């Protein structure tokens, strides 16, 4: 099964550009690791650099942090180029921070979903918790500036409005999210999710 997974036919229609890039990036990341173990350092650096470019382009935050960490070590030990080392170190710090912020947003999102859907908690309790989380996450959204962070944060914001039956506030928030996410052209599933929410919110407003 492991061997088969390395030879997936990503030319099939089910794979969009981002899915293809995801598979290729992780495959190449593993290949570069193997080259490092075999002391083929320059070849490993070349593959890591190429993969890093794709990981940044398609917003694979965890992978970007991992690749930049490996490159940071390789440039520190092998290349003797302080400019390259500082460039990669900066990318590593930036994406470790993004990774941390995404994890914070995910934890708040999962906690709230547990109250909102699983426990079926009273609306006042959900509204209070959603407001607390949103007010923590929203001001630092630009520091993260990732699609996943925006998704978790704005979904929490929507739950805050829904729990207070505030349709107008929810619609304004969805429109704000879509305005930000339209720049993230490789995250169509998240854009579609908020677009669907926007359409569903227009109907009750139109019937008031």
Sequence positions of predicted segments:
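Flexible inter-repeat linkers and adjacent short helices
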Residues: 1-131, 144
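Structural signature of alpha-solenoid helical repeat junctions
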Residues: 23, 59, 63, 149, ...
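Glycine-rich, often proline-containing surface loops adjacent to acidic residues and nearby aromatics
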Residues: 26-28, 149-158, 197-200
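Residue-level signature for tetratricopeptide repeat
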Residues: 34-35, 54, 72-74, 115, ...
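The canonical alpha-helical register within tetratricopeptide repeats
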Residues: 50, 90-91, 136, 176, ...
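N-terminal low-complexity or simple alpha-helical regulatory segments
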Residues: 77-80, 88-94, 137-163
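Extended non-membrane alpha-helical scaffolds
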Residues: 161-208
């Amino acid at each position: 099964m492991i061997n088969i997974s390395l030879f997936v036919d990503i030319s099939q229609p089910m794979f969009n550009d981002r899915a293809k890039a995801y598979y290729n990036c992780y495959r190449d990341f593993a290949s570069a690791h193997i080259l490092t173990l075999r002391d083929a350092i320059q070849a490993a650096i070349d593959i890591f650099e190429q993969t890093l470019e794709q990981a940044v382009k398609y917003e694979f935050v965890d992978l970007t942090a991992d690749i930049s960490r490996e490159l940071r070590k390789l440039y520190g030990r092998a290349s003797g180029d302080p400019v390259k080392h500082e460039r990669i170190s900066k990318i590593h710090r930036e994406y470790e921070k993004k990774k941390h912020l995404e994890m914070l947003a995910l934890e708040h999102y999962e906690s709230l979903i547990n109250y909102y859907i699983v426990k079926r908690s009273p609306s006042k309790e959900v509204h209070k918790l959603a407001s607390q989380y949103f007010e923590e996450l929203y001001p630092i959204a630009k520091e993260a500036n990732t699609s996943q962070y925006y998704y978790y944060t704005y979904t929490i914001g929507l739950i805050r409005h829904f729990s207070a039956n505030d349709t107008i506030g929810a619609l304004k928030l969805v429109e704000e999210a879509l305005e930000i996410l339209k720049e993230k052209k490789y995250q169509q599933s998240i854009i579609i999710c908020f677009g669907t929410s926007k359409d569903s919110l227009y109907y009750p407003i139109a019937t008031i």
